[in-house]
Amino acid sequence: VNKSEYLNQPEVIDFLAWFERLDHDDNPSPFNHKYEIETRGRGTTKTPWACTSLYNAYEKYSWRFSYTDLFTDKKIKGTSYSVSKKALDDFQNRLHDSIIRNCNETCYKACNMILDWGGVLGSEKKGNKKRLLELKPCLTKHLSEVKSIFESNEVTLGKKYTIVENKNETQIAMNAGFTKIYSLLCTDFIIYDGRVGAALSLLVRYFLQQKNPKPSLVPESLSFYYGQARNKNVNRNPSLDPYIFRALSNSPAVHIRNNLKANWIVSEFSKNTASKFKDQNNPSRCIEAALFMIGYKV
């Protein structure tokens, strides 16, 4: 199933129509969501968070980040959407420039900073940094081929995603870290992590509950995977029998399929929405930010 075929499925068409009405003033079922943000470390104080619409969730974006700028050796910190966007714009410019110039060193630094910003860098011995170091000798070529695949009109919801390097078939890496790199590498590609997956799953559940008075199973086209939180007090599983959603695991192909479906949904929504998102510089990024905030706890 490619993008066109996916978006033309009846249940996807219905979900998009419902999704686009969420922030309309005349919506009989306005979207509201609230939770308490758990304190990091040993603290017990919880911070209440609530939104009265999808757009309001974007307006209330807050996420603490820090990373080291490998080009200036400065430590950069922030919490707001605008400061985070400034960092992402810088990463994206450096990433694209390095690929144009075929400079693996600059490309590696840009990717390293993206992962560091996202809190998913890992180390030289394990995790995303280890994988990045393995790819470093041919990183610009590798990412160029990944970009070509993900931006193709013919990319499908397949069982595996690979590229051929030195006559060897290499599986495309995908997890909560690499989705951040691909989001800045490719056009119309959102960051799909556990929180975004949880939010989309929750919205699908609400849609199905409102659409069908008689409960039904979640159609595969709208089955999004959520990610478990590290904190056991943070629930990101929106399942409510018979609406059952699955958790992301270590399968790159499953993560990519979910990311592609989310890309297509968010891109289509951003082009057709009559909400305040349309007035933003990058509607898809703003919608992603809203989903990220909603999906902290469901």
Where are these regions (language model features)?
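Alpha-helix boundary/N-cap detector
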Residues: 10, 79-86, 102-105, 109, ...
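Helix-hairpin-helix
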Residues: 161-186
